[in-house]
Structures are given as structure tokens and as C-alpha cells.
């Protein structure tokens, strides 16, 4: 079955983004994904008020603010004087899941408020990959995601199962499974305040405060299930076997697309694109 632009639900999740008004995101999405259902899911009351006033969304989902955890990493020298970025994993899970649950169509695009698709190329990619066979019996299909921070653990940050969480495109039931990860525990968020780093840790890895990266928590719960032990015990738990097993299994669950291949504008991460192009998986 070939999918078209008018058979999808688009879920935009997150707080207001300062670079541009969300009105322009919706206008562009309506152009390139005509007749699609567009849903806003947020706990940002100022954004919700603004969205209701605009009247451009098909549905608006108000989500309770579950609060933030301590920052994912300890402050480094280069971070001094910069605003502290807290760990928003539980807010992300809740806003994304509640929005996806409201989707009316079987095919769903979930995107952040600070990103936008400039064309509809993701539909062409989906129609290209949707029938590729795999050994995965847990999900209905694969999820298309971005190469932005889909980290290859052979390089400077050796974190397997670190698949980007910034964008998902796939079947509704698969996105529900992805965002049905359990609440991230507080003791995991401050893990390295009381635990010693692995002896092989490098400078990029030993600034982590959290036991796992957000992306690892979502990816491993999605692939292995909520009640199954993870194949890694901490963020940079690494071996040749772990990498081999990871690279064997993840293509059955994800297609990792370079932003250019899906016309993804993610200006917030422009400064990281050299890293993304050299150290992340990609189409």
C-alpha cells in the first residue's frame, strides 16, 4: 500500500521555540502535507494559549507538567556561565505519548516544536522502506528517525543504543510503544554522583551524571520491552559483542535518515552537524 500526505497525523510536541512562531510551522506543514491531521501536545501554557488563539491545529492536547530531573551531565569548563539544561525525559515521554494517542491515522509523524520538515520527502522514504523484510516480530514496522545524535559507538562517545529521539515517523502503534517507556527514575538521573565511572571512560563519557542517555532509555525499552533486562548496564558499557549485537538488531526497528534526505530543518543543532556527519549513523 502506497501512503500519501493526507493519510498521516502530525504530532508537534514540546514548549514554545523562540526562533520562529509555530504558526509558520503549521503553514508549511499544511502546504507539504495537505489534509493531514496536525496535533499540538504541550505542557507550556503560554504556547497552548497562543495555539488556541491561532486556531490552526486540528487538536490541542494539554499535558500535565511532570517536572524536570537534574541535568544529564555535570557542568564542564566550557559550560560555565551557560544556563543549566535539565533532564526533561519524563516531560518528553508524557507530551509525546499523549499527542500520539490522539492521532486519528495509522501513520504518524512526531516532531519537536523546534524542528520542521521543509518538504514531504519523508513520505517517499517511507514508501521505499516500508516493505523491506525484517526479523522483528515485536512491532508493525520500522520507525524513521534522524541521524542527529544517532551515535556510532566506535568513536568519541561510546554509547550503544543511542538512537536519535528527535523525530519519529511510523505506525501509530509503534510510536505508542516507543513512548511507553517507564518514567525515568531519579536515582538513575544522579547515578554518577554515587557510582564510579568504568575504567575505560574518556573525557566525553565521564561528564555524565545520568546512568543512561535519554535516547538509550527510549531505544532499549522500545526494542527489548519494559520488563526485559537491558544489554548494557550503564551509558558507555561497551564491547565488540555489544556493538555487534546492537548493529545487528537496530536496523529491524529503525531507519536512520540524514536531515537532508528528509528535508529536516533543525537549526538548533547546526553547530553539531560536523559531529553528526562523522560520528553518527545515517542514510
Which role fits each region the language model picked out?
Residues 14-21, 87-95, 210-214:
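Soluble or luminal CAZymes and related metallo-dependent hydrolases
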Residues 41-102:
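Active-site-proximal specificity loops/subdomain of glycosyltransferases
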Residues 1-21:
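N-proximal low-complexity "stem/linker" segments adjacent to membrane-targeting elements
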Residues 6-8, 30-40, 58:
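Short loop->beta transition adjacent to catalytic acidic/histidine clusters or analogous donor-positioning motifs
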Residues 111-112:
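Active-site acidic Asp-centered loop
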Residues 108:
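Short aromatic/hydrophobic "clamp" motif used to bind/position activated sugar donors
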Residues 17-32:
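Short, well-formed alpha-helical segments that are part of the catalytic scaffolds
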Residues 117-124, 129-282:
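Catalytic core and acceptor-binding pocket of nucleotide-sugar-dependent glycosyltransferases
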Amino acid at each position: 500500500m502506497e501512503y500519501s500526505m493526507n493519510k498521516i497525523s502530525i504530532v508537534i510536541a514540546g514548549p514554545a521555540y523562540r526562533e520562529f512562531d509555530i504558526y509558520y510551522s503549521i503553514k508549511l506543514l499544511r502546504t507539504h502535507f495537505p489534509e493531514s491531521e496536525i496535533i499540538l501536545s504541550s505542557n507550556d501554557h503560554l504556547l497552548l494559549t497562543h495555539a488556541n488563539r491561532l486556531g490552526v491545529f486540528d487538536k490541542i492536547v494539554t499535558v500535565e507538567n511532570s517536572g524536570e530531573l537534574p541535568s544529564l551531565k555535570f557542568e564542564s569548563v566550557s559550560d560555565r556561565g551557560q544556563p543549566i539544561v535539565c533532564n526533561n525525559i519524563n516531560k518528553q515521554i508524557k507530551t509525546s505519548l499523549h499527542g500520539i494517542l490522539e492521532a486519528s491515522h495509522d501513520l504518524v509523524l512526531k516532531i519537536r516544536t523546534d524542528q520542521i520538515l521543509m518538504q514531504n520527502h519523508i513520505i517517499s522514504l517511507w514508501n521505499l522502506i516500508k516493505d523491506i523484510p525484517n526479523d522483528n516480530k515485536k512491532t508493525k514496522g520500522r520507525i524513521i528517525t534522524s541521524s542527529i545524535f544517532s551515535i556510532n559507538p566506535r568513536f568519541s562517545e561510546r554509547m550503544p543504543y543511542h538512537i536519535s529521539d528527535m523525530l519519529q515517523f511510523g505506525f501509530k502503534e509503534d510510536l505508542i510503544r516507543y513512548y511507553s517507556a517507564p518514567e525515568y527514575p531519579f536515582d538513575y538521573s544522579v547515578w554518577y554522583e554515587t557510582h564510579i565511572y568504568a575504567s575505560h571512560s574518556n573525557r566525553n563519557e565521564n561528564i555524565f551524571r545520568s546512568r543512561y542517555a535519554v535516547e538509550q532509555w527510549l531505544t532499549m525499552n522500545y526494542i527489548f520491552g519494559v520488563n526485559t533486562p537491558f544489554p548494557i548496564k550503564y551509558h558507555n558499557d561497551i564491547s565488540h559483542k555489544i556493538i555487534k549485537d546492537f548493529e545487528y538488531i537496530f536496523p529491524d526497528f529503525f531507519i536512520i535518515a540524514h536531515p537532508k534526505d528528509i528535508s529536516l530543518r533543525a537549526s538548533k543543532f547546526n553547530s553539531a552537524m560536523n559531529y553528526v556527519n562523522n560520528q553518527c549513523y545515517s542514510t
